[in-house]
């Protein structure tokens, strides 16, 4: 090699080493339930985050910088969520994907907003979350105020029950959804016989089942999560009830079928569309399956989209406030399709679908 070639090679090596020296890791806090009764939804979130970060980094990351996931467990518990949020602050992380449950997301968001940390939640649906004038809170899912009307419309137009009961778990997510469904059913002059709450964590629902039978209830909407829904379904069917049940995406988990068995067949659920069935997402589905993980969960995809949204913002600025401004003013291409946000941080035009849940843990479009 002549001197000119050696000089050129040396220059290329120096440039490469220089780029490596300046490349840095961008830490992203991914917060969800790794323990507790709804840890299955945390599994979905972390599956989506892990795959999104791997795919983003494989394509060069953010201007050569790699995203690094730092996992935190809030167990969907408000007090633990606050402790986690404070740890995120102390760890010096500026970007959060999470939390999952509305009841834990809201108190954590207070801390993030005060500390200038961007939070994109892939699952919290409570309208109150983005109704407080915060600048750094966004989401990649819809609202209870979207999901409730979708459920009520289907109940009134398709199911047409005569006597309806609405039951919830007394938590922000479940009760908020239940009230949204109730309000919309009343607008349609549907007969809501009773609206009542159970306690999350209960396993004996014989009193509720007896009341459903006594009141001749032919349709139940349940606002809450899968552990209680699974028990209610199993016990209702064991008592001979033919009542139709419906719930939100919080019950749409394969663990529901593990609890309820064949009693889960025919449950109606509202949830985001089946993004794992979108042809363009097949390479991601295959990559997740290759790791023996499940790509079907709704929060796999809303989390993946949250990371894509964060990446789009980071390509413009590393300032959380500037990222939030950018996302609210632009559209981002994601696995969910193009996403855009309003001034509050809510998605524009997000739609929930209605699905038939099956005993094998899958969901198909409801007729």
Curated annotation (Swiss-Prot):
Pfam families: Peripla_BP_6. InterPro entries: Leu-bd, Leu_Ile_Val-bd, Peripla_BP_I. GO terms for biological process: amino acid transport. It comes from the Bacteria. The keyword Disulfide bond applies. It is found in: Periplasm. GO terms for cellular component: periplasmic space. Residues 1-23 form the signal peptide. The keyword Mitochondrion does not apply. Keywords: Amino-acid transport, Disulfide bond, Periplasm, Signal, Transport. Its main location: periplasm. Disulfide bonds join 76-101. This protein is a component of the leucine, isoleucine, valine, (threonine) transport system, which is one of the two periplasmic binding protein-dependent transport systems of the high-affinity transport of the branched-chain amino acids. Belongs to the leucine-binding protein family. This is Leu/Ile/Val-binding protein.
